[in-house]
Amino acid sequence: FPQYGETRVMTITGEATSFRLPAQTTTFLCPQNKAMSGWMRTKPCYEEEYKLDMPMSEPSAFGEGYTFPCLFRIGGDGWALVSETGTCGNYVGCHLSDYNPDTGYTIAFPMPGESNGIGQTSAGVALPYSTPWRTITLGETLKPLVETTIAYDVVEPMYQTTRQYKPGRYTWSWLLWQDGGTNYDDQVKFIDMSERMGYEYVL
């Protein structure tokens, strides 16, 4: 947004960005849970159960839309991954709305109460200002979506790293065994498994 005359700041309360996908599209989406619910009122914590290969018309489990990244199968024509990048402390983290046949999926701002009274559900920005990126990665297979670096390519680094970091494959005990799997013996198993599979990392 450019600066208009003497205007120095503005409040962004929503976005008109929307994504319309072909009718044959099915979804692989993580539903956004209600604010301040769940264990220690930490939701939405982006760890809900994905539903696989669902029609776009299927409402989200909690009526609050979906957490990024959002994966779509375009029938037999390929795949699309919709996400965001470049969100920092002066903008809100967004998600996708439920599907609407007229508008598709739209960018949804945080729910009231999501910040637990700290911060806002809108963005107050100094002008000039650029909003975060909304990205779409397409592929005939999942390979380009898994290997994309778009989240890093379109943003300016916020700091200089002390070493070269490289994307790679990994194993992760917590994903399978949750908190009970975060112990020494299980980590050794996952380190060994990463080595056997030729993976670069263990989380």
Question: Language-model segments: which ranges?
Answer:
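N-terminal accessory beta-strand-rich subdomains and adjacent acidic, glycine-rich linkers
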Residues: 1-153
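An acidic-aromatic substrate-binding cleft motif
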Residues: 126-201
